[in-house]
Each structure stands twice: as C-alpha cells, then as structure tokens.
Amino acid sequence: MKILVLTGSPREHGNSNTLADHFIRGAEESGHEAARFDAALRNVHPCTACNSCGMNGPCVFDDDFNFIREHIISADLAAFVTPMYYFGISARLKAVIDRFYAINGSIRTPKQAVLMMTYADISKRKESPILTHYDVLPEYLGWTDAVRIIAPGVWAEGSISRTEFPKKAYLLGRALSRQGASSQ
C-alpha cells in the first residue's frame, strides 16, 4: 500500500509528529511504502484562487507542493497529522489541503483517509472544529474515513510520550492491510 503522511507541526519532536513517526514505523514494518511531507518545514504557497489550474491543470506556484502532487495521486491512503492551533488544523497543513484544488480531478479516486490530531485541552467539544472540517474532506473527495486517533491533553513537546497514543499510532500502521486501514 502507498501511504502519504501529511504533517502540520513545526516542532520536529512535537506531539503530532511523534504520532506520525510511530504510524510510519508501523506501516513500513508491515511492508507498506510511506512518503512523508512536513508542511510546516516546506515551502507551499497558499492558494490564491486565481483558477489558473482550472481544478486539473498545473498550479501557478512552483514550490514543494509538486512533491505532494505525485504522491497523493498514487497514494492508497492519506494520513493527516496535525496539532490543534486555535481550534483548527495548523495553517501550514491547511495551505497544503487548499492546494488540492489544482489536482481535484486527479485525487477524487477511492482512497483511505486517516486523521491523527493532538491538542492541549481535554474537552471533547474543542475537537469539533477540526473534526467538522475533516469530516467533509474525505466525503467530498470520495475517500473512506478509515480511522482517527484523537489525542487530548498533550501540550508540552514530548508529553505525548507518556500516553498510549504513540502505541496506538504504531499499531494502526502495523494493522494496515493491503485493502486499507482497520480500526484500533
């Protein structure tokens, strides 16, 4: 299975990146091919809605999104891994998702989607802005929302290491079948 992991944290050893690391390790140990794109560390220009791409052509910006283009088109599973920033996904990951517009026709094919998110609060209510946004994304693209790992109560860098969430991410990666994700 080809997997594209899109991360949004600028902290190399941040909590959501820890989830991504464990997920990728589990997936690769199970024989899957995983490509990773750390949006916060790459140059992806925000979409300006110029419509030059026409939802299927090249984007006017020649930047690191070109790496994603081929990987997302060929991926069987896309994993979105983000910290919550002011009740939403990180701006850098959002910029990547907005640029999906330029390849809209090419990525509206059957795929699996996984969400892994971290946030400092412990209130379930605080999750809802990200979950509402995420719910619509795979639905619109015709993808299957396979599994979610929601990790509340982690704020300080590395605090997730004292929880069960890294193990859950690893086991999710290990449990991937050739057909897709299976619930944990």
Ranges and model annotations:
Residues 125-128, 158-163:
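Short, solvent-exposed loop/turn segments at secondary-structure boundaries
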Residues 1-4, 114-115, 149-156:
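A short small-residue
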Residues 10-13, 85-87, 120-124, 154-157:
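Short histidine/acidic/glycine/proline-rich micro-motifs that form metal-
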Residues 1-82, 87-103, 163-184:
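N-terminal beta1-alpha1-beta2 submodule of the flavodoxin-like/Rossmannoid cofactor-binding fold
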Residues 91-92, 107-147:
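Short, glycine-/small-residue-rich phosphate/pyrophosphate-handling segment
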Residues 8, 39, 117-120, 151:
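Cofactor-binding loop segments of dinucleotide-utilizing enzymes, especially the Rossmann-like FAD-
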Residues 36-38, 61, 115, 147-150:
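Structural signal for conserved beta-strand scaffold positions within catalytic alpha/beta enzyme cores
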Residues 134-152, 160, 170, 175-179:
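A charged, well-structured terminal subsegment
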